[in-house]
Amino acid sequence: MTHLGLNMAAAYSEKNAHILCFDNNQEKLDQIKKGALPFSEPKLNYLLKKNYKKIFFTSNPSDLKKCNIIFIAEDVKTNKQGISDLTQVKKLITLVRKHANSKAISVLLSQIPPKFTRKHFFNKERVFYQVETLIFGQAISRALKPERFIIGCLRPEKELPTEYKKLLLSFRCPILKMNYESAEICKTAINMYLASSITFANTLAEISEKTGGDWEEVKKA
């Protein structure tokens, strides 16, 4: 279970969804069930304990046949050159293709380059790319109160599958449908904006310190 996957599982369970968390590392799952999380995130353990009757864990991929909606939530790492390693995402897609039932909906949450969803998925009528922008330290609050859902679809003009739409509507925020590539670019654009905002703030804080200004006062203004 990744940071992205576990936080989204906790958030969805809070909306009364029953969650099956898959990881091929049974030892990791056993530790998570005991409350020993592989990372620190405020309120995550609290929600997992609160909703333990709705969250189940498995290392058996055959159990995916039980799922109506399958979220692929691999944390994608990038190297110093900014190149993403998509190996694990591709492996998970292959695993889902092999074990999911034919009526299941697949939703990709991971950060991937434009055209990835269209190229690597099967049965695209039932495949969606959902933009998530969780931040370490704020993941649960952002997962529980999204500003909007950006959903990449094969046919944006069509209604979303009933179960998927019901889950999204439970968060009471706008749902923006668009084609796969537009949604994938949105994810990149949001991340670039967040990164540039941090750089911009750090630069202004440094200027304030060097010139005698008070960055806290500047921020308030």
Regions picked out by a protein language model, each given a short descriptive name:
Residues 64-69, 102-104:
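Short acidic/histidine-rich motifs immediately flanking catalytic phosphotransfer sites
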Residues 1-36, 56-59:
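NAD(P)+-binding Rossmann beta1-loop-alpha1 motif at the extreme N-terminus of oxidoreductases
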